[in-house]
Amino acid sequence: MKKLYLASGSPRRRELLTQIGIPFTAISADIDETPLANESPLAYVERLARGKAEAGRRIVTSEPPFCVLGADTAVVLDGKILGKPVDEADACAMLMMLSGKEHEVLTAIAVLDGERCESRVVRSLVRFRSISREEAAAYWASGEPRDKAGGYGIQGLGAVFVAGLNGSYSAVVGLPVCESAELLGHFGIPCWQTLNAQ
């Protein structure tokens, strides 16, 4: 059985991968996340997911066979990528832009072994209710939005802003479990392994 490495420091991605019963080792694979000139949001998230998987592969010292899973999520409003907020003003500005509107969340996953790399991009639409400036400031003060694309976490306190979701909840959190299980299956890594081991 191939060993799996998750090239991510995200605790949410670790939780989601654990949820589907796939044993893995998490590794940190930092790459430059600056968008390229004229790069579409879809191309951006796919490039970053592949880049993280490739960076992870360079870190791994295990003998083959193994696979590396990389992922990236972008919040997109009117074609513009909203990254992780740099400070309170940035986070509040993002939330005010998202307030009362529908936005797109793109999550890309990439799996590679020594021979090939396959990727998928999952698109979800999230609709926010109206948010007051006071709510945005209080949310920032909670600490939750600091490391989140678009300045919010759907799985935490930020859920109160979400009026609707069309797509994959787990993809908005950071790892689309259905597509991840399918893609890992193509590489001979089945889900529910930890259930069979008990």
From Swiss-Prot:
Its main location: cytoplasm. The active site is at 72 (proton acceptor). The keyword Chloroplast does not apply. The record marks 12, 73, 155 as: Important for substrate specificity. GO terms for biological process: nucleotide metabolic process. GO terms for molecular function: dTTP diphosphatase activity; UTP diphosphatase activity. Its cofactor is a divalent metal cation. It catalyses: dTTP + H2O = dTMP + diphosphate + H(+); UTP + H2O = UMP + diphosphate + H(+). It is found in: Cytoplasm. Keywords: Cytoplasm, Hydrolase, Nucleotide metabolism. Belongs to the Maf family. YhdE subfamily. This is dTTP/UTP pyrophosphatase.
